[in-house]
């Protein structure tokens, strides 16, 4: 495990470049800062300033090296590196509420933006007019879209929203792609077609994720439940009520293992039993260390006042919090190995810190941990 504290401000979202040498983060304001690794240090190399509202989503396309951002100003920008400068292109989303999340499609020929306008904007580039245009997926979304994830086929899109539902839509754009092949989710996929809708969640759906194979979708809700639907099992949904505080992010690290994190400030493992069709709690991945009793320096005390709004010595030192992150984990991303066989993943949190977790090291450190 490697932990780096970038700043006192919370990290509201992040994205990595292709070779994992640079990370783009939002320091909880209208800017995006890009840091580059140099030895053991992270140096700020770029600042992207175009939004006039808080940035709520960042995604970095690995092949085209383009960054897409969205924010509470109801806009999205596609950033292209020209020389040593990132140049923004405005994308009109045609929404009247804040944009909340953004994700590039796997083929990088379109991206999706979820918003408070109860729509998902599917944006693609029109060569004839030399600009980005968007189509809206509207029905039957009844509240803010908080999370998105693409199916590997570049067409299906999973969305979690504040109406307590996880849904899968077709985001097929005939202008930029060929007709998709049938999937376990269905064979007819016109734009906006609802392929699946959950009925088991009882809270805002904070995070959603497709498996590497694309036949499973997992999501986490504000009622502290984790759910997984398997299209190859007649859309059977497995639900587990966890004992943690609400989870905010989730990702597959193998076809049967998932990592999630949220307000408890540490990542946890969940395992799916394919034969039984059930989810189980696999354990906490952040091993608590015995804290040595020591006094706080003035600098540490003021930093912790900012991070945790706490002046109590125990809470400030982390005696009350024995996790690596000292505040809620807001995002998880797979660093290497992909969702099929992840070897490293990254978490960023409201404490302004970023952690890199090595799966093999976690398995050896935690004797009872079995990642299948």
UniProtKB/Swiss-Prot annotation:
> What keywords tag this UniProt record?
Actin-binding, Cytoplasm, Cytoskeleton, Nucleus, Repeat, WD repeat
Residue pairs linked by disulfide bridges in the UniProt entry: none
Domain of life the protein comes from: Eukaryota
Q: Which Gene Ontology cellular component terms are annotated? A: Arp2/3 protein complex; cytoplasm; nucleus; tubulobulbar complex
Keyword Nucleus in annotation: yes
> Where the protein is mainly located, per its record?
cytoplasm
Q: Give the Gene Ontology MF terms in alphabetical order.
A: actin filament binding; protein-containing complex binding; structural constituent of cytoskeleton
Q: What PROSITE patterns does its record include? A: WD_REPEATS_2, WD_REPEATS_REGION
Record flagged with keyword Aminoacyl-tRNA synthetase: no
Which Gene3D superfamilies does this chain map to?
A: YVTN repeat-like/Quinoprotein amine dehydrogenase (2.130.10.10)
Record-linked SUPFAM superfamilies = WD40 repeat-like
Q: Where in the cell is it found?
A: Cytoplasm, Cytoskeleton; Nucleus
Q: Which Pfam families match?
A: WD40
**Sequence ranges of the WD repeats:** 6-45, 50-89, 94-135, 140-179, 242-280, 324-367
What are the GO BP annotations of this UniProt entry? Arp2/3 complex-mediated actin nucleation; response to estradiol; response to estrogen
Tell me which family the UniProt entry assigns to this protein: Belongs to the WD repeat ARPC1 family.
Q: What does this protein do?
A: Component of the Arp2/3 complex, a multiprotein complex that mediates actin polymerization upon stimulation by nucleation-promoting factor (NPF). The Arp2/3 complex mediates the formation of branched actin networks in the cytoplasm, providing the force for cell motility. In addition to its role in the cytoplasmic cytoskeleton, the Arp2/3 complex also promotes actin polymerization in the nucleus, thereby regulating gene transcription and repair of damaged DNA.
Q: How does it assemble?
A: Component of the Arp2/3 complex composed of ACTR2/ARP2, ACTR3/ARP3, ARPC1B/p41-ARC, ARPC2/p34-ARC, ARPC3/p21-ARC, ARPC4/p20-ARC and ARPC5/p16-ARC.
| Name of this chain's protein | Actin-related protein 2/3 complex subunit 1B
Q: Which gene encodes it?
A: Arpc1b
